[in-house]
């Protein structure tokens, strides 16, 4: 069983994720299928138009659906052994995410919501060419976040300190992120590292 919770509402966490309501298990020798949910904060429909996903939202949906497929189709005998090696966790989701902009896949789902016209090949080329736009800055952000995570896990003396000042020093002064752009990957963003079931 797969449930979807696509739209933002008050009190709902930001971002998107996939998780279990019930893990796959065996009971009395019979396999019980998992109950899985994909949660997101996609653009809501309006009074005059359906929910039209941006390219980023579409890739996110494909990504989380990759996790959902992994959860739905694994088959383990002992609970708690359903996990895979840490470096494999994101593979199914990355594969699905990358398929989102493949021309053959786009032709199946990317249609105009009024005319039902399939996305033109010229627009597909533009989408694929734009995928690398601003990649240098995106990579810098990710590297800065990774190095900052290493910084906080490399503290040798445990004494009270100001985490915001520590983070600002790590992200702006040491990594050179420009002050005009707020860092996307602040420490609270990393909740999945210690909160996830990896």
Model-derived features: positions:
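Cation-handling catalytic/transport regions enriched in His/Asp/Glu
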Residues: 1-198
């Amino acid at each position: 069983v797969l449930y979807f919770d696509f739209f933002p509402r008050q009190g709902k966490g930001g971002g998107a994720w996939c998780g279990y309501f019930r893990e796959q298990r065996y009971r009395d020798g019979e396999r019980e299928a998992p109950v899985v949910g994909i949660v997101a904060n996609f653009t809501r429909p309006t009074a005059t138009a359906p929910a039209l996903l941006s390219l980023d939202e579409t890739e996110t949906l494909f990504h989380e659906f990759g996790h959902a497929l992994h959860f739905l189709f694994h088959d383990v005998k002992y609970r708690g052994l359903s996990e895979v090696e840490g470096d494999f966790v994101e593979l199914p989701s990355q594969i699905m995410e990358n398929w989102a902009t493949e021309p053959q896949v786009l032709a199946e789902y990317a249609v105009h919501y009024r005319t039902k016209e399939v996305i033109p090949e010229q627009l597909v080329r533009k989408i694929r060419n734009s995928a690398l736009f601003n990649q240098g800055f995106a990579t810098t952000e990710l590297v800065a976040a990774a190095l900052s995570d290493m910084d906080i896990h490399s503290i040798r003396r445990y004494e009270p300190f100001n985490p915001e000042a520590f983070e600002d020093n790590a992200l702006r002064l040491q990594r050179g992120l420009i002050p005009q752009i707020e860092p996307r990957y602040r420490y609270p963003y990393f909740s999945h590292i210690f909160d996830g079931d990896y």
